[in-house]
Amino acid sequence: MFGWHWLLEWQTPYEFHGHLIEKVFAEEKTPYQHVTLVEFTRFGKGLIIDGKVQSTLYDEHIYHELLVHPLLLSLPKPPKNVLILGGGEGATLREVLKYKSVEKAVMVDIDEKVIEFAKKYLYEWHQGAFEDKRTSLVITDGLKFINETKDKYDAIILDLTDPIKDSTSYMLYTKEFYEKLRGILNQGGGIVTQATSPSFSLEVYVTIYNTIKEVFKEASASYTYMASFDGLWGFVYGGVRPDLLSEDEVNSRIRERISGQLRFYDDYSHKISFSLPKNIKSEFKKITKVSTEKDPIYVPA
């Protein structure tokens, strides 16, 4: 943060995106991270964690719909039990609860203060999802929860902060962690994770794909443009192949499974999001790294 007026968000060690800030609603250094709620001049209300924009009112729906719906629509059966790790704004939870079949949505976040801020300032994100009777909110470390849970899930959604070295999410992008997730999935289940930016950290994006494919065998990658992130943003899915869904299948499953409106995701945006451009696809052939606990991948910024 540069004073109270500008956020200088470092995308790489040698470039940043400057955001003009109109107002600061709340700011606190929690035991886990530095959390700030602001009003951006261009993007409206927004959440910043450790100097990185997490989401803004302008385009959060694009991120959250592409994170959730390709996974849940590609499951062979409509999901009943869904686990969310992270996603403190409540918007991922909001999208999961649009599924008529969902009986229980467990959301695990390490930082109670983020949830508190979201409930107070980010209604446009959660839209009451925290109070839904199907919601189970757990405040704990994600890895601790995974190690201790006795339940199994139809889908696991990882809406985590970037794998910045020594951050709270640093080790939640490794082969060993994904193996733990595989162990608590029901048969036919799948996972998705936000996978950083093909624009600024292409090697990380591809390595996350490689790591998930190593564990789940079936994997696919999507991307979209996020104006508030100043570039492309990526997602990786494991255990299922949403990229193989036809446009007709996407449309029919939206009608069958979802109650409520979608603002971004439809058959056409699905097709475009999984149509990786040639220059990005070529990197999947060149980069072979798999992220492990001994040699984890991380965003350099």
Curated annotation (Swiss-Prot):
EC number: 2.5.1.16
InterPro entries in the cross-refs: PABS, PABS_CS, SAM-dependent_MTases_sf, Spermi_synthase, Spermidine_synt_N, Spermidine_synt_N_sf
Residues of the PABS domain: 4-240
Record keywords, A-Z: Cytoplasm, Polyamine biosynthesis, Spermidine biosynthesis, Transferase
Annotated metabolic or biological route of this protein: Amine and polyamine biosynthesis; spermidine biosynthesis; spermidine from putrescine: step 1/1
Localisation: Cytoplasm
Gene Ontology terms for molecular function: spermidine synthase activity; thermospermine synthase activity
GO BP of this protein: spermidine biosynthetic process
Residues reported in the UniProt entry to bind spermidine: H64, E89
Coiled coil start-end: none
Primary localization class, coarse: cytoplasm
PROSITE patterns (UniProt xref): PABS_1, PABS_2
GO cellular component: cytoplasm
HAMAP family: Spermidine_synth
PANTHER family in alphabetical order: THERMOSPERMINE SYNTHASE ACAULIS5
Job description of the protein: Catalyzes the irreversible transfer of a propylamine group from the amino donor S-adenosylmethioninamine (decarboxy-AdoMet) to putrescine (1,4-diaminobutane) to yield spermidine.
Name used for this protein in its record: Polyamine aminopropyltransferase
Gene responsible for this protein: speE
